[in-house]
Every structure is written in structure tokens, then in C-alpha cells.
């Protein structure tokens, strides 16, 4: 069985940005923030205009031909996506999944919304 540190080692395979760097992108129309926390957490508050894509269903949103296929990714191949979760773990894995499934310009907020709250 994999250890937690092994699981999180994928952080070295993705692009991570700080909450401060993410804040600079908040009003950029070419950037879409994606909240991968559960629906309940999302409904309590999110970052700016972030859309909700539950981490547990992410592959179903990304895979072509799946019931939840999201045209946003297909129709906006040059858009930048900034992913976040609560503290960074789910965001890291979601960013890696998106990258592996062909999303080219995707970044993870290190420390998630918890770090974002510190700089608001």
C-alpha cells in the first residue's frame, strides 16, 4: 500500500502556485478557478467565480464520451485552470489527474483555500 508521502509526491509533477500568485489571476477572464472540495464545503464559500467540480467525479467530467463530460475543457483548450481544495491534497491529485487527462494549462494552489483565507 502506498504511503501518504508517496501519494503526495505527484506534487513534483504539476505546477503549483502560491495563494498570492493565484490572487493576481482572480479577475483574469482567461483563468477559471476550480474548487474540487465536496459540495457542502463549496456551498459555504469559495474563491471568486470558482466552479465546483467534485474531486470524486473529476474523471467523469474530463473523459470524452462520459455522462458528465464538461464542454468547458473541450471548448477552451487555451484557458488556464487554477485548482484548489481545502488544504492542498485533493487539489494536488486533481491537478495531476487533469494534466494526465490532457488539460494543458492547469495549476494547483499550494495550501488550498486555507492559504487563500490568510491573504484575503
Residue ranges of model-derived segments:
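Rhodanese-like catalytic fold shared by cysteine-dependent sulfurtransferases
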Residues: 1-31, 39-80, 89-120
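Short, surface-exposed ligand- or partner-binding patches at beta-edge/loop junctions that are enriched
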Residues: 84
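Conserved active-site aspartate in kinases
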Residues: 35
Amino acid at each position: 500500500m502506498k504511503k501518504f508521502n508517496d501519494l503526495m509526491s505527484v506534487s513534483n509533477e504539476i505546477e503549483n502556485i502560491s495563494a498570492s500568485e493565484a490572487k493576481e489571476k482572480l479577475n483574469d477572464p482567461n483563468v477559471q478557478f476550480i474548487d474540487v472540495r465536496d459540495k457542502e464545503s463549496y456551498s459555504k464559500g469559495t474563491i471568486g467565480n470558482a466552479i465546483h467540480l467534485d474531486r470524486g467525479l473529476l474523471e467523469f467530467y474530463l473523459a470524452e464520451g462520459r455522462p458528465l463530460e464538461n464542454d468547458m475543457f473541450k471548448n477552451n483548450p487555451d484557458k488556464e485552470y487554477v485548482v484548489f481544495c481545502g488544504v492542498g491534497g485533493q487539489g494536488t491529485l486533481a491537478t495531476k489527474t487533469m494534466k494526465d487527462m490532457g488539460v494543458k494549462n492547469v495549476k494547483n494552489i499550494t495550501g488550498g483555500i486555507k492559504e487563500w483565507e490568510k491573504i484575503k
